[in-house]
Amino acid sequence: MAAVLESLLREEVSVAAVVRWIARSTQGSEDNAGEAAALSSLRALRKEFVPFLLNFLREQSSRVLPQGPPTPAKTPGASAALPGRPGGPPRGSRGARSQLFPPTEAQSTAAEAPLARRGGRRRGPGPARERGGRGLEEGVSGESLPGAGGRRLRGSGSPSRPSLTLSDPPNLSNLEEFPPVGSVPPGPTGTKPSRRINPTPVSEERSLSKPKTCFTSPPISCVPSSQPSALDTSPWGLGLPPGCRSLQEEREMLRKERSKQLQQSPTPTCPTPELGSPLPSRTGSLTDEPADPARVSSRQRLELVALVYSSCIAENLVPNLFLELFFVFQLLTARRMVTAKDSDPELSPAVLDSLESPLFQSIHDCVFFAVQVLECHFQVLSNLDKGTLKLLAENERLLCFSPALQGRLRAAYEGSVAKVSLVMPPSTQAVSFQPETDNRANFSSDRAFHTFKKQRDVFYEVLREWEDHHEEPGWDFEKGLGSRIRAMMGQLSAACSHSHFVRLFQKQLLQMCQSPGGAGGTVLGEAPDVLSMLGADKLGRLWRLQERLMAPQSSGGPCPPPTFPGCQGFFRDFILSASSFQFNQHLMDSLSLKIQELNGLALPQHEPNDEDGESDVDWQGERKQFAVVLLSLRLLAKFLGFVAFLPYRGPEPPPTGELQDSILALRSQVPPVLDVRTLLQRGLQARRAVLTVPWLVEFLSFADHVVPLLEYYRDIFTLLLRLHRSLVLSQESEGKMCFLNKLLLLAVLGWLFQIPTVPEDLFFLEEGPSYAFEVDTVAPEHGLDNAPVVDQQLLYTCCPYIGELRKLLASWVSGSSGRSGGFMRKITPTTTTSLGAQPSQTSQGLQAQLAQAFFHNQPPSLRRTVEFVAERIGSNCVKHIKATLVADLVRQAESLLQEQLVTQGEEGGDPAQLLEILCSQLCPHGAQALALGREFCQRKSPGAVRALLPEETPAAVLSSAENIAVGLATEKACAWLSANITALIRREVKAAVSRTLRAQGPEPAARGERRGCSRACEHHAPLPSHLISEIKDVLSLAVGPRDPDEGVSPEHLEQLLGQLGQTLRCRQFLCPPAEQHLAKCSVELASLLVADQIPILGPPAQYRLERGQARRLLHMLLSLWKEDFQGPVPLQLLLSPRNVGLLADTRPREWDLLLFLLRELVEKGLMGRMEIEACLGSLHQAQWPGDFAEELATLSNLFLAEPHLPEPQLRACELVQPNRGTVLAQS
């Protein structure tokens, strides 16, 4: 494999040819003959190139001090050795991947050969983190291997080096030379666990002082040391050897002893590492300089290696995509590099070739390599959460090395809406009683029924006790609850009792542990009347603070072991403490049935023709439904795998030899608890892999070492491997899987391939032609895989370890490093002033629990009634506050504004300044709204509840319902008021200020004369709304149906026009829309006067106005139009076809009033002659009766031809032809 890499670095073969050579066995048409010949001889070793490359990069970066959890080295048979080293290991023999440190590599020269034959992962040595204590490598027996970058000793054919000896005096702080009292020295082949402590930094964030490392293999910052393979690292912590149970006490003793030594000596003491070792001392030579692209060495080599590394990642040739991204982020954020000692022998340039010289010679090389890789995977980076994108976009190293990539990341951050919350959901309430299944008819006897009810109560007592005590230090589940759980299991003798209890257990599991949105908790919602006053920005900061305090800080590195976080731990411990075969069997049956039901659930299909925006909006509900189903399936499958493989799990190492063969023969005859292979095949054929694969991964993560060797499960792993190879992220086309769906599958499959029980060489096996990745040809064209059902929130909920990328970048920003024991949480406090005494969160949580318990024991109609009352009373409370408190404040604002106007005089003031002055005085009074709202809800809610509930409701139930309704209504009302009362007061005050200032009219310079009401105006004019109603009554009486005795008096018309003048002159309550409406109504009234269509009260013979009265009213209207209306008056409506057509119904037709009105409009300058001529011309285009059209033409000619007179001399114009015999009427 080294030959391939050297050929690549010498540019004898291209990167594309190497990638094609790795990915497929046949020669591509793109490969030239020279490249094919160079690679054809190494075809048998093709599968070992990728692990060799990964281990090579780990070893080359071993001198870098990374930030955050270290990245494990890669795997199987191929080690990162150069040619001349003994051959690779056999496929069958493997070491336990779960051990924290691999066996020592150089205890003797004879130990090298057995080590090379181990099938375990080859881990390159790496530097220790610099921190207050000793490095991870301290205390390692044997000598370290010399060489630049921490490379291993070469075999035959590699240049030899002079042996180096130590001449330093003994170091009393070396735990290897001077171990703690009572410790057992490790033997070369010891199988008993060592009591010597490999010290790790003790901090509060590490649960039980476990080192924050990847569980799959040791970090790159560890050198080999002895570690017994019998030590079990199973997630439930069974089978720890007795020698390891007092690790905490020995850690405390070691820490005290070290503090004494530091107090006695002025300088820190630490073991002196062997010369040539990359281990730095406490005062070692460390460089801390900013990365500079101009100081990158071997730029061409780095670009080639980065390109082939990126190509392997893009083609899914590496087991875990996000593990490689984490490694790249480590290189990007590396701060220091261990410098070589002056006494180290330097290699001659003649000896160094392209592979022997260090790849990463400085921090500049590491950052350059990382940036080159990240540029190739921008599509993956752009789909990370918004916080990670922000940290990447603000990384100064990215800006320095690749401004283009930094700009693209910033654009992706600005356009991203993927805000991810990792807050764990809170514990929910108990499962309500199920009358359809848990009734007496479903039990064999009364005794069994009562036993079940009793055990149900015991179960919830145990659950409540666990919730109260499980976080207390020193509390143990088995000691506290184990005997009670086993006694409860002993009483469930009947099979039906087990079945009912398992159903309850499963429902409670789903209700407590299911997290559809990934975010839970109601901490911020418990005091909305206070928190909503913070504003959107500060409230968002408080949300982020809550997430940082409640979310788990670390998931155990980029490859955490399968665990049971939060409430899941209760159900795991319950199963272990129960130790009941019957319960486990019923539980497996119930879980299997529920998994098959949910996996076959019909989910909405995606329509590919939808527009992107509309599709995204429409699919929000479908995404939530899919998330609920998927998370439920993952939870159920996790517990099914845990229970199904529990009998086979143990602390002992996996069997080998004949024992393994006999176990395989025996277990191959046992049918699986669930036919997961068939379900997987159906899911792939139906294109529902995004639903099936994630829960299958959870199930397989708890398999023991023998399971992957069984033929049944071997087929499953082969299918998953081929699916992993087919999910190439760069291949996007019509009908292909959505990008985030692929990313989810790659993340869960990559995590599965790092599980210790999965064969190390499985991922790099040669693909046999016999077992093809079969997909049904009649598969649906569009399935769940093609639907955008996965978003970033679901991705991070299913794969929380992806969040380690963000934490790694955050540790770089905050300046933390390995010496701080982990990541630092930099929190900026946000404070606020409380509006009043608020109940504690504990009290509110208790009240909510009591309310839920109360409703569980009552009919559903009671809950609906109480919620209805709370909703309506809360709404009425808000309306009441608007009508009382807000209205009073608006009146105060008007009074204060008038005082301000009088004080400032005619020049007035700035409206914006006036508004701010008024709001600053009145808005603080909005705090009274909360007290008034609580009083209103307490006064109104009980009566509403009593009115709606039945009379036979018990007094205690009625009282509790009233109290709950009061609380809910108060919460709803106060939540709205606290969030909106200030804005509501500002809006109403602003409207009042605008109305008052508008009534004052425009500025004197703009209007030429005063157009508003006078200072002495008392504002007693009729309201515009009332006046509009009265004018409309007259208009409707004139044009609509009426009784013969209905009509209006001339005096009423004059009074109406007088009131119109008063309203127009006193503009206190007149707004532009009302003024426009009044103008239109006045024009309609003038049209009716001209047509003589207004019925007049009086003697039966008199139903029309006298000519003098009509002209007097028209004069009043002309005066109003001329003097009082400030807005435009639609006088063109006078000559509209509808209004002129009113004259057609008059017998005899009299046109004198219309002619008089037109001449007055011209005289007063309200309309021009050209405008009237245009209106009259448009009237000729309408369809009129013949005689009316002739009279209208005569009127037009007369108006345009005759000179204008002050008063018309004719009562009726000569508008008809003589042959029609029309009598002329003279005035």
From Swiss-Prot:
<feature type="transmembrane region" description="Helical">
    <location>
        <begin position="626"/>
        <end position="646"/>
    </location>
</feature>
<keyword id="KW-0225">Disease variant</keyword>
<feature type="transmembrane region" description="Helical">
    <location>
        <begin position="312"/>
        <end position="332"/>
    </location>
</feature>
<feature type="compositionally biased region" description="Low complexity">
    <location>
        <begin position="155"/>
        <end position="167"/>
    </location>
</feature>
<keyword id="KW-1133">Transmembrane helix</keyword>
<keyword id="KW-0597">Phosphoprotein</keyword>
<keyword id="KW-0963">Cytoplasm</keyword>
<feature type="region of interest" description="Interaction with ASF1A/B">
    <location>
        <begin position="188"/>
        <end position="208"/>
    </location>
</feature>
<feature type="region of interest" description="Disordered">
    <location>
        <begin position="63"/>
        <end position="294"/>
    </location>
</feature>
<dbReference type="GO" id="GO:0008104">
    <property type="term" value="P:protein localization"/>
</dbReference>
<feature type="modified residue" description="N-acetylalanine">
    <location>
        <position position="2"/>
    </location>
</feature>
<dbReference type="GO" id="GO:0006325">
    <property type="term" value="P:chromatin organization"/>
</dbReference>
<feature type="compositionally biased region" description="Basic and acidic residues">
    <location>
        <begin position="247"/>
        <end position="260"/>
    </location>
</feature>
<dbReference type="GO" id="GO:0005634">
    <property type="term" value="C:nucleus"/>
</dbReference>
<dbReference type="InterPro" id="IPR028171">
    <property type="entry name" value="Codanin-1_C"/>
</dbReference>
<keyword id="KW-0539">Nucleus</keyword>
<dbReference type="GO" id="GO:0005886">
    <property type="term" value="C:plasma membrane"/>
</dbReference>
<feature type="modified residue" description="Phosphoserine">
    <location>
        <position position="285"/>
    </location>
</feature>
<dbReference type="GO" id="GO:0051170">
    <property type="term" value="P:import into nucleus"/>
</dbReference>
<keyword id="KW-0007">Acetylation</keyword>
<feature type="compositionally biased region" description="Polar residues">
    <location>
        <begin position="214"/>
        <end position="232"/>
    </location>
</feature>
<dbReference type="GO" id="GO:0005829">
    <property type="term" value="C:cytosol"/>
</dbReference>
<keyword id="KW-0472">Membrane</keyword>
<feature type="compositionally biased region" description="Basic and acidic residues">
    <location>
        <begin position="128"/>
        <end position="137"/>
    </location>
</feature>
<dbReference type="InterPro" id="IPR040031">
    <property type="entry name" value="Codanin-1"/>
</dbReference>
<comment type="function">
    <text>May act as a negative regulator of ASF1 in chromatin assembly.</text>
</comment>
<keyword id="KW-1055">Congenital dyserythropoietic anemia</keyword>
<keyword id="KW-0812">Transmembrane</keyword>
<dbReference type="GO" id="GO:0005737">
    <property type="term" value="C:cytoplasm"/>
</dbReference>
<dbReference type="Pfam" id="PF15296">
    <property type="entry name" value="Codanin-1_C"/>
</dbReference>
<keyword id="KW-0360">Hereditary hemolytic anemia</keyword>
<feature type="modified residue" description="Phosphoserine">
    <location>
        <position position="265"/>
    </location>
</feature>
<protein>
    <recommendedName>
        <fullName>Codanin-1</fullName>
    </recommendedName>
</protein>
<feature type="modified residue" description="Phosphothreonine">
    <location>
        <position position="71"/>
    </location>
</feature>
<comment type="subunit">
    <text>Found in a cytosolic complex with ASF1A, ASF1B, IPO4 and histones H3.1 and H4.</text>
</comment>
<dbReference type="GO" id="GO:0012505">
    <property type="term" value="C:endomembrane system"/>
</dbReference>
